[in-house]
Each structure stands twice: as C-alpha cells, then as structure tokens.
Amino acid sequence: MGEALSNLEIARGAKLLPIEEVGRSMGLREERHLEPYGRHVAKVDLCAIEDLSERPKAKYILVSAITPTPLGEGKTTTTVGLGQAFSHIGKRATIAIRQASMGPAFGIKGGAAGGGYSQVVPMERLNLHLTGDLHAVTEAHNMLAAMIDNHLYHGNGLGIEPHSISWRRVMDVNDRSLRNIVIGLGARTDGVPRQSGFDITAASEVMAILALASSLEDLRERLGRIVIGHDREGNPVSAEDVRGAGAMAVILKEAIKPNLMQTLEGTPALVHAGPFGNIATGNSSVVADLIGIRTADYLITEAGFGADMGAERFFNIKCRISGLEPDAAVVVATVRALKAHSGRYQIKAGAPLPEELLEENPQDVLAGAENLKKQIENIKLHGVPAVVAINAFPTDHPSEHKAIEEAAKEVGARCAVCRHFTEGGKGAVELARALEETIEENERERRRGGGGSFRFLYPLEMPLKQKIETIAREVYGAEGVEYDAEALRALEGFERAGFGRLPVCLAKTHLSLSSDPALKGAPRGWKLSVREVRASVGAGFIYPICGQMRTMPGLSAHPAAERIDLDGEGNVVGLF
C-alpha cells in the first residue's frame, strides 16, 4: 500500500472547472456578477444579492462542533464534504467558509481549505493571498492608525487622550516580538512617542466589520463608528472624527465582494472574511450568505470553535444582521476529542497523540460525551435541530462510534458516521440524508404547531450585564459571573454612551466550555470571570474578556514555515 497523499498533492491532482462554469451552476451571470482572478477564482459583485432575490431560498445549515482539542475536529472538512455529499443524492449545495489567515498557515495550525478529498481548491491560492482581501484589511486598519498618530502630531485638535488609544496596528504574520512596542521614537518630527503594539489581521475590528457588513454603504457606516479612544473629557473618539473612515472604505471597496472557488468535486464555495473566533464572531461574511442562500437547495456555512463560541455568535450576532434563519445545525465530534473530554488524556498541538488515546475505550468516550450533549443543547436553545457528524478516523473503533450515537440519542439528535476526508462527498451521504430528514421532520412538526422555531437567546433591550450572565448560564453552564471593578466601570460607561443595545461576544478560551482551558467535559459549579470589557462599536458588539486572550500569535519551535518552499518547477511544497 502506497504512502497517503498530502492535502496539497490531492488538491494539485484535481481537475478544476472554469470558474465561470461554477458561477453558472449557481445562476450567476459571467458578464454581470463575476470578476475573474485567473481561471479558478472570481469575485462576486454584490449586485447579485438583489438580482437573485426572487429565487427560492436554500435550506440554511450551520456546521459547528463540540469543544475542540488544539488539533481541531474537522469543521471545514465536514462543511466541504457535506456540500459535496448533497450532489450524490441529487441536490445542489453551495458552501460558505472563512478566508484563511497566512499567519496560522505558516505556524502550527496549517491551512483552512479542508482536508483529504474534501477541500476547497486551488488550496494554495486560498491559504496564500487569494484575492488580497486580508492585505486590504491590513492596509485599511493601518491607514486609520496612521491617521490617529498624524492627528496627535499636528496639534491634537480633538483633544485625544494618548493613553486611551486602543487602535493598534496589524499584520498577517505570527510575530510575538511585536505584541508590545513603543512608537514615535527618534527626532521630534518622527511622531508622538507612546506605547502600542501589533495584532494579527484576523483580530482587527476591520475584519469583523467586513464579515458583518450587509452592503458597501453599511461597510462605510460601520467603519465610521469605530471607537479608537476617548478625549480628555472621556467622550468616545471615532474613525469618523479623525477623518479616516472614507479612505478605509475606498481601500476595502473590492474586498467586500465574496470570493468564488470550488471544492474537489465542483461544489461552489464562497470564501470570504476571516474574523478571529475568540474576540469576534468567527463566521464568514453576511454578504456571502445573502448571495449563497439563493443559489442552491442547501447553503452550508461553518462557525469557529465549538457551539458555545461560533454558533452562539452566529445565531445572536450574524443572523440578527443578515435576517436569515438556520434550518439545522451539524455538531462535529471526534472520538479522540471526546476521550480528551473525559479528563484522562492530554492533547497538545504539535505533539504526537498519547498511545493510550488510540486504544478501544467506549467508556471514556461516554464520559467525555457530556460535552457533546451540552453543545447539542446549545444549538437547541435557539430552536434549531441538531445532527451529530462523527468525523471518523482510521484509529476509531465501532464501539466508540456506538457510544457517541447513544449519547446523541439521549438528547434527541440524529447521528451520522462521516468519512469524507478519505471518500469525499460519498463519505458524507449519510450525514446529508440525516439533515434532509431532520429538516423535513422539523417543518412537519412546525406545521402541526410543534417543532422548533429559530429564536435569539436574548433581546437587544436587555442590559449588557444581563446579556453576559444569560450566555454564561445558559450556554457555558456557569453558576454565576464575577466582574473585576474595571469591567463593571466599562459596562456602566458603555450603557451611558448608548452602546447598551449591542449584542455581546464573550472572548474566552475555545478549549473549554468554561474560561479555564484545563476544565474539560461539561463542568459545573464554576463562575465566569470577566476581567475587562471592550467595545467593537463599528462591528456592532461588546466583547467582555474572560481570561488571557492573545491577539498576536507566536511561532512554535518548528513552525510550518520551515517546511514550506518552492520546488524546481515553481510549485509550492510543504503546505498542509
């Protein structure tokens, strides 16, 4: 038996359709809607939203997961595999995923195109530059930073308090040495010295805005609302105040258009925006979904990390803006992650899996399945039916899959074993059929007066503090919330400033339902600790900080960048 092909080798061996043909399969017109970037990538003009508005809406499916290990559990791969699977049962699907950040691609996480025989291609285009959207976000963000420092240098007419400036600079590289810096050093003509730093581009509020804007006009308005600090009287100062928002909108004029690609089996893939999953929504763009919802029988999108993180924000932030209501959600689970949630194993990024983790042990799977059950409940809290996708690995045992099925059944969820990594769409047909049946069953129940109807977890009128406590209690399973004094002052200030009607995006670890990454399973009897609260007013949410959040990653001892190169024919090698 030969050595297994790498993701890059599989992707490179694919026969791709011309991007115009992919667009036509969605009902997009080449001359009006598509702006090709080479043979296999195109931008989609936003006029498609209006042009397609009379077409039937697709069924809207979210792909989420259990609380992941540092290795990830395969949401993107499942999203791609599921999209391909629908064509095997005579249905059309479009998928919508986030755009990759180059920092993690050269770090330890690798790319974001899926894997095996369920990938978006060309995968090296997706993982490296694509159409330059991340560079546009970087440029727009840093343009505002330059405008702020220029305003300080030329007299500071707005009376900005330099120590209050929260707008740092960004770049799409993992570089820990830039987390904290001093700028403006040198001669008097070199600027006003102050402490600042760099974040990774995915953590920029501009990226969050790109993901949530529903039109070019909405993008411009949101950019103007960005709060960069406050003046000497404590009043917020915006990007509009420093006259930077217009230039930012110009830089992002093309970036707001979603990118069209395809999967290995020719399923259309809208790839757009990549906000951080910790301090932002972790979802792909609203405009991609507004286009995709009119192009197929099913639109499948994903949300970052576990259902407590990306899915909760998808429901309560993204869906409020888009006006779209999901018909079902997938919860991706793996045997290895559920064993880890038993608390008996430790999985570390970049390290080999513990030998004992690969041994047959359905009891440990059942012990860790408390996390799965809680994440299914988190989906159902919003009136959305859930289906569990067991992302199967060759080291799994049938008894372990049966344990997952039993746990899912306890909380009323169907379950499907998926092998889309090795089999492509054929390997996720069971999941596609389970979703089709679940959606039809829910619609029948609804017509009879039962069944689930989509609902938000909280109304926008609810005070910020109460919103935080509702999410902590209902979604995370906390018994209460503890606030640092600084966090309470910030909440009071945001309410006074008129930001109290914004939704809340809790920034916490993705490795636990709690704010402590070491607590596995579905912990009880703990309290969420909120140490500070920040506002992304332009993006349109408040984000409390729970625990330590890194917004500029560092490289590992042996990052992927060490293995990435060009071969003698100019082809990329080592990307995964």
Swiss-Prot record:
GO terms for biological process: tetrahydrofolate interconversion. It catalyses: (6S)-5,6,7,8-tetrahydrofolate + formate + ATP = (6R)-10-formyltetrahydrofolate + ADP + phosphate. PROSITE patterns: FTHFS_1, FTHFS_2. It holds the Pfam family FTHFS. Its EC number is 6.3.4.3. ATP binds at residues 69-76. Keywords: ATP-binding, Ligase, Nucleotide-binding, One-carbon metabolism. This is Formate--tetrahydrofolate ligase 2. Pathway: One-carbon metabolism; tetrahydrofolate interconversion. The keyword Chloroplast does not apply. It comes from the Bacteria. It is an enzyme of class 6 (ligase). One of its GO terms (molecular function) is ATP binding. Belongs to the formate--tetrahydrofolate ligase family. It comes from Rubrobacter xylanophilus (strain DSM 9941 / JCM 11954 / NBRC 16129 / PRD-1). Disulfide bonds: none annotated. InterPro entries: Formate_THF_ligase, Formate_THF_ligase_CS, P-loop_NTPase.
